[in-house]
Amino acid sequence: MPEGPEPISELQRLTVSLRGGFEQKDRCLVFHFTGQLDAYSEKQFSEYASDVLKANKLPALFDLSKIDFVDSSGLGALVQLAKQCTDAKRAFQLVGNTRVAQTIKLVRLEEFLHLVNDVPTALRNLSA
């Protein structure tokens, strides 16, 4: 089991507007977030994800399918996490709902962030 923050069955409150947690599934870290990924929450989002990533070497899946809103600060945090994964030679995938995917595609980051449509597809890609 990964060290660092404990995996939890319920999402913990990272800020007033963002909850997050992770689980280990199919030899991958699966992060789940709900709420808003914006200027107010990006610092806590980044710190939480970075702490978990630094504690182990498993591939990472960021499930943002329940995120209501992403602004430029949130996109910046996602880019930094993607760079952290790339620098560590860690495979990663990102899943988003229509709103999140549209925002990512608007700034042409879908390939850089390894955006896919759903969690099963992401897990398949990471285990290949």
Predicted regions and their residues:
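Terminal low-complexity, poorly structured segments
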Residues: 7-10, 71, 102, 122
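Short acidic-hydrophobic, aromatic-tinged amphipathic segments that line or gate anion-handling sites
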Residues: 114-121
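STAS-typified acidic loop motif
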Residues: 6-50
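Amphipathic alpha-helical interaction surfaces in cytosolic regulatory modules
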Residues: 36-113
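A short, charged, amphipathic alpha-helix used as a generic interaction element across diverse proteins
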Residues: 122, 126-128
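Short, low-complexity N-terminal regulatory "tails/caps" that precede and couple sensory modules
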Residues: 1-5
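N-terminal hydrophobic or amphipathic segments with adjacent small-residue motifs
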Residues: 21, 29, 68-70, 116
